[in-house]
């Protein structure tokens, strides 16, 4: 899936995946979404981090393949963490809504990509 290029443009996805892998993936994602929802303001790199974490969650619980992710790593995480990560959908959607309400990107294509992530995680897509 070659989507979401506006959200991940110039973002080091590999480094984030390494950070998630070196931690407990469900705990890392939970913390990321909680911090994103609670922060008074979000920088563009922080918005990108939340979007990539939401993409990881979507890949794990909705069995989607994203071109930018290492497929073997995601397959391993699906096997071990899908059940625990399924509980994070609501917090991910809440964090993405928070971005759209308070830190809406200027790029309309990035906004559309965020809205698509919300739909995917909400089960509408």
State where each predicted segment sits:
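Amphipathic alpha-helical scaffolding segments comprising HEAT/armadillo-like alpha-solenoid repeats
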Residues: 30-31, 63-71
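Short terminal alpha-helical segments
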Residues: 1-41
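Short, hydrophobic/amphipathic alpha-helical patches that form generic packing surfaces
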Residues: 47-63
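Alpha-helix initiation and capping sites
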Residues: 10, 22-25, 50, 62, ...
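Residue-level signature of the C-terminal ends
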Residues: 19, 59-63, 99
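Generic structural signal for well-ordered, non-membrane alpha-helices
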Residues: 27, 31, 51-55, 90, ...
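Amphipathic alpha-helical binding modules
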Residues: 76-125
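Catalytic toxin/effector domains delivered as secreted proteins or via bacterial secretion systems
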Residues: 44-45, 71
């Amino acid at each position: 899936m070659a989507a979401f290029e506006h959200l991940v443009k110039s973002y080091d996805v590999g480094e984030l995946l390494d950070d998630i892998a070196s931690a407990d993936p469900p705990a890392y994602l939970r913390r990321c979404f909680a911090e994103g929802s609670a922060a008074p303001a979000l920088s563009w790199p922080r918005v990108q981090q939340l979007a990539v974490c939401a993409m990881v969650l979507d890949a794990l619980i909705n069995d989607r393949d994203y071109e930018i992710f290492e497929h073997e790593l995601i397959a391993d995480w699906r096997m071990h963490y899908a059940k625990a990560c399924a509980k994070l959908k609501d917090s991910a959607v809440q964090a993405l809504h928070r971005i759209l309400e308070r830190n809406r990107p200027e790029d309309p294509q990035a906004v559309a990509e965020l809205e698509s992530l919300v739909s995917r995680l909400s089960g509408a897509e």
